[in-house]
Amino acid sequence: MQIVKSNGNPLPFPQNPLPNKLIGFKRIQIIYIDQNVVAFLRRFRRIFAICAIDLIIITENVRISEFVVLNIWPMLRDSIRSIILNTVAFRRLRQLAPTMLTDCPSLRFVMSNDDIFSEFLIDNSAMASDCQAVAKWLFTPRSDGLPKWFRCSVNSPADQWSSTMEQLKMAFSNASSPVTFFIVLKLSSTLIGSVVPFF
């Protein structure tokens, strides 16, 4: 493992404790992960506790997702402000931590370039679909009242799309507490003509 500057030059891996004057970082990009990386990240726990973290997990490797949940997620969870996931990573993370979204008190933005907007029944159990877990997170109010954002692509057939929108309307009608959120959908060309006013 090595640390590399943005210009590609490797830096020595630090062995000493982090200096107290270090109060944050702009970006940490991890391409390879093992216990050495986890040990290095643990030295940043003080900073993770005071920073807003924008986390991106794009992997097709199930074992990497499992490693992230077991070793890195507990360190970052309370400070994650936004998370970008692909379907494989999201599904595996949720298998290991079904309530991963609602367990992040600072989380305001969830994005996936994959289609996980297939049904809008609110559920947070281990057996819930990815979309049901997102629905549960969206309808769980933040303590500060700030709105949440969810963004994904939609490639569903038109009839499934209509059913999902009806479920979303019903969820709004049945909400037990006021919530504010935005949903941004990137529709496939076949669905553009299916868009109708929400109410």
Question: Model-flagged regions — what are they?
Answer:
Residues 1-199:
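The conserved beta-strand core of Leucine-Rich Repeat
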